[in-house]
């Protein structure tokens, strides 16, 4: 014995390792395409609910949410189209230069969506609970629903960003 202690792994079953490439939610997969479609759907519902309120344009936060949802819809639909085309022709987006663009675009869109959702939710609470003008006149339910769908859209695009960034960081 030389006095050094070397530990060896005991023989046993192979250790299962989890790899990001095995996930079906990274760009260019059916899971990612479904996530993009869900992002688009949540954003379009938020947009539709907000513009259905007659006086949304009188509040800056609500106008910002509408603009953020338009950006979210355009971004999600564009990326979904690219991912759908890549799947159709059998091309992988894992090593594509578009991956950096997807990560930055998802991050920027997520930040703008979150800001719009927070601002709109804050104004909806202010109008509904603090000013006491009556929510029937002020469409508080619609404002809250639009903010809720915007938060859902933000959650979905944040998921896309995290997986895309993780894939970008590990390649």
From Swiss-Prot:
Keywords: Cell membrane, Membrane, Transmembrane, Transmembrane helix
Subcellular location, principal: membrane
Localization per record: Cell membrane
A GO CC annotation given for this chain: plasma membrane
Topology class, membrane: Multi-pass membrane protein
Superkingdom field: Eukaryota
Record's keyword annotation contains Transmembrane: yes
Topological region Extracellular: 61, 128-148
Ranges in the topological domain labelled Cytoplasmic: 1-39, 83-106, 170-171
Keyword Membrane: yes
N-terminal signal peptide: none
Transmembrane segments: 40-60, 62-82, 107-127, 149-169
Subunit-level organization: Homodimer and heterodimers.
Family: Belongs to the Casparian strip membrane proteins (CASP) family.
Name of the featured protein: CASP-like protein 5A2
